[in-house]
Amino acid sequence: MDQKLRSQEEYKKFMISKPKFKICRRLGPGVYDKCQTAKFSAASSKSLPGGKRPKAPTEYGVQLIEKQKIRFSYGLSERQLSNYVKKVSGVKGAGTADKLYERLESRLDNVVYRMGLGSSRRATRQMVSHGHFIVNNHRVTVPSYEVKIGDIIKIREGSKAKKIFENLTEKLKDYTAPTWVSFDLNNMEGRILAKPKNTETFLNINAVLEFYSR
């Protein structure tokens, strides 16, 4: 099979809607929090039907896998991720990979997730969309809203009594947020302390950039 045709076939495979288990098995448990369990590890360690081993992906296939990891991890559409890459590719200075990571991590839905206020990015995306947060005294309902150093994120007064925010003290007692964000339980507000630093070993952002440069 010619390289171009094989690349197209690989791409189509990833466009098929799959249950989360299959997505995690293909892309790795880091994509969804629910896949980071002993049960998933045991199930995913089983060989393919017939004892077959998965074929080693092509270079294009590896790049595609990394792209899909980011898409599913942050809950982005193809267009959204493509636009992020275009924006950082035209920025001079620091490495493009670092800039892309900063943009992704600075999304409000991700920041709320990093503060420990939701069990997943999908959950915090809904929380933001439903208007539960105030950023610098303004209600924000756009999950992709980009926060900056010094921004203050508060739980809206009318939302504090809602079930999703019950027992926050208990939920956060063993949680350690990244060093670039903080959350004050007494005042029910968080703050952006610094730029996000890429400490992820699960994501290969350079491979994603290579995918879009093809």
Language-model segment annotations:
Residues 127-128, 147:
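Short, well-ordered loop/turn sites that connect or cap secondary structure elements
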Residues 118-121:
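Beta-rich strand-turn-strand
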Residues 2-115, 142-214:
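Ferredoxin-like alpha/beta domains used as RNA- or RNAP-binding modules
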